[in-house]
C-alpha cells in the first residue's frame, strides 16, 4: 500500500497526484493500492480537489480538529509525505516522490 498524506492547498502534493494515479492504474488491485490521506485541509476544498485533480483512488479525510491525527502517529511534519507499506504493514520507505517512487513500487510489485 502506498499512502499519500496531502492537502488541496499543497502545490508539491498536487504535483505527485499524476504519479499516484499512474501507479494505481498500473498496479491497483488485490496486492496494491494507493490511499490518499487528506490532512490539515477544509472538507469542501478536499472534495473539490478530488474532482479537479481526477483522483479516483481511495481517500480518507481527517478533519483539522481531529485529536488522534494520523500525522502524529506517523511523525509527519510536512506534506507531501508518501509512505510505502509492505503486505505485513511494515514501512518499506517514506519520503517517496517522483520517478524514485515509481521505480520502487515497480520493483516491489515484481
Predicted regions located by residue number:
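Conserved hydrophobic/aromatic "anchor" residues
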Residues: 5-6, 32, 49, 57, ...
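Catalytic cores of extracellular degradative/oxidative enzymes
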Residues: 8-11, 47, 80
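Short, contiguous acidic/charged loop-to-helix segments that flank catalytic cores in large enzymes
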Residues: 8-12, 25, 37-41, 61-62, ...
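Short active-site neighborhood of thiol/selenol oxidoreductases, capturing the structured segment around
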Residues: 1-11, 20
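Conserved helix-turn-beta segment immediately C-terminal to the redox Cys motif
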Residues: 15-37, 51-52, 103-110
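Thiol-based oxidoreductase modules, predominantly thioredoxin-like and allied folds used
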Residues: 29-45, 55-66
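Thiol/disulfide oxidoreductase modules built on the thioredoxin-like
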Residues: 15, 51-56, 62-108
